[in-house]
Amino acid sequence: MKYIQAFMNNFLGNSPDWYKVTIGVFLVINPFIFWFHPFIAGWLLVAEFIFTLAMALKCYPLQPGGMLALEAVTIGMTSPEHVKAEILANFEVILLLMFMVAGIYFMKQLLLYAFTKLLLRIRSKLTLSLAFCLTAAFLSAFLDALTVIAVIISVAMGFYGVYHKVASGGTFNDPSDITNDAKIKQNMETLEQFRAFLRSLMMHAAVGTALGGVMTLVGEPQNLIIAEQAGWGFKEFFFRMSPVTLLTLISGVVTCITVERLRLCGYGEKLPRKVWGVLAKFDRAHEEQMTTQDRVKLGVQVFVGIWLIIGLAFHLASVGLIGLTVIILTTAYCGITDEHAIGRAFQESLPFLSLLVVFFSVVAVIIDQHLFAPVIELVLNASESVQLLLFYIFNGVLSAISDNVFVATVYINEAKNALTAGAISPYQFEMISVAINTGTNLPSVATPNGQAAFLFLLTSSISPLIRLSYGRMVYMALPYTIVLSIVGLLAVEYVLPGMTQWLAQVGLIESPHIPMTSVFGH
């Protein structure tokens, strides 16, 4: 009995007992359900994995989700070879997480300096929210959304750390455990207000990455896949999407203003005066203590930042490799040569990278068990008059459950097969391509598992500090989800066809412009 108790204490560590039992039940019943009905077992596994993400603040999803994925491979729901194929297919994302996030860590001195100035000068919360949302949207149109979120997380961690040290009775330079609130007594209410303030900024920025990412060829990984199948370059892709994306960008800005003014769904909390005072004092102290060497370091980081933007905007190398150059340049010219100091930069990204590989295992199960097959068949067999609506709706729903890159890849391949077989016209294929791209990018803000950037935010070290749980992310994203989904749907149905014809008439796009090449597999 003593050993059983010890085993249960070790199993999933400090997680609640009910959570441990729930995961144990999942592991016991899954093989039996798979033996009885593989299709049901596949959907159950997806639901269980989403449950582990929803409980991320109770237990990091890597361990429970990893055990579920490991069991799925063991009982034959998918194969190790297929999991490896999914990992290789997403190798660019893996490189990005390994190196780019670590690279941003070494630029946090510049980021904290710049954003502290921004925060202190813009006193209006509404203006600040719009600044975060639109800046994230602009950057995500040219950079990767994960990179943008990594920057925002680094900034938020810096702000939180500065105030937490002072609220705990320390000074700016004191070492402090920012996860421990035990020393905070009088300032607890202010800290909660500051957490709400940071939560709202983080969510505005996260949604901003989706608003900007959908607009351009390089904004999201699935955009490249869709553009390759349709034969669109950077300019044509932008104009093809513009009838939908410009409307959703405007509606996103209006939503940002509305939720802040009406204080809806957890938005509207202003920066507490006490916190502003602490940050202002920190900024003054930082300026006074800054040596010539420190200013040179900031200058180096500015030049590396310029290289980062140019490298990503012009695709001079893969995102991950550009991230590696950022690590090399910042550490070399800022004098960071200690192995342990370099190693700390990877602490944020590697747990999430491991979780993402587990997620690819679940995607492999979805493919092998044909979980989306009935939906795909339904959409492709529908009449042309409702096809665009169905493509948009089902891409949106499935992207909120699964990974939007995977959903977009499956649907664009099926649509290309239908085109090759003569089931749909070239013009209809082009309309469908826009519906797939906007459908996977916009409604997927509904849940953290829809977009890798959202999932990264949920599982980052800032989320437990500011109490940003899965449920709270869904709740705070709700106004954006409703508005973007509806506006996107109406734009696809009523604005897209007419605007596409007008854009073709004025020579901004070519129609149809589709290379009749063989369809690649996923």
Swiss-Prot record:
Under the heading InterPro entries, the entry gives: Na+/H+_antiporter_NhaB
The main location is: membrane
Query: Where does the UniProt annotation locate this protein?
Result: Cell inner membrane
Q: How does it sit in the membrane?
A: Multi-pass membrane protein
Catalytic function, reaction form: 2 Na(+)(in) + 3 H(+)(out) = 2 Na(+)(out) + 3 H(+)(in)
Q: Show the GO cellular component annotation of the record.
A: plasma membrane
TM segment ranges: 25-45, 49-69, 87-107, 128-162, 201-221, 237-257, 302-322, 356-376, 388-408, 446-466, 476-496
Recorded GO MF terms: sodium:proton antiporter activity
Keyword Zinc-finger, does the record have it? no
User: What does the UniProt keyword field contain?
Assistant: Antiport, Cell inner membrane, Cell membrane, Ion transport, Membrane, Sodium, Sodium transport, Transmembrane, Transmembrane helix, Transport
Reported function? Na(+)/H(+) antiporter that extrudes sodium in exchange for external protons.
The family note in this entry says: Belongs to the NhaB Na(+)/H(+) (TC 2.A.34) antiporter family.
Q: What is this protein called?
A: Na(+)/H(+) antiporter NhaB
Q: Native species of this protein?
A: Actinobacillus succinogenes (strain ATCC 55618 / DSM 22257 / CCUG 43843 / 130Z)
What lineage, starting at the top, does this entry show? Bacteria, Pseudomonadati, Pseudomonadota, Gammaproteobacteria, Pasteurellales
Whichever gene encodes this chain, its name is: nhaB
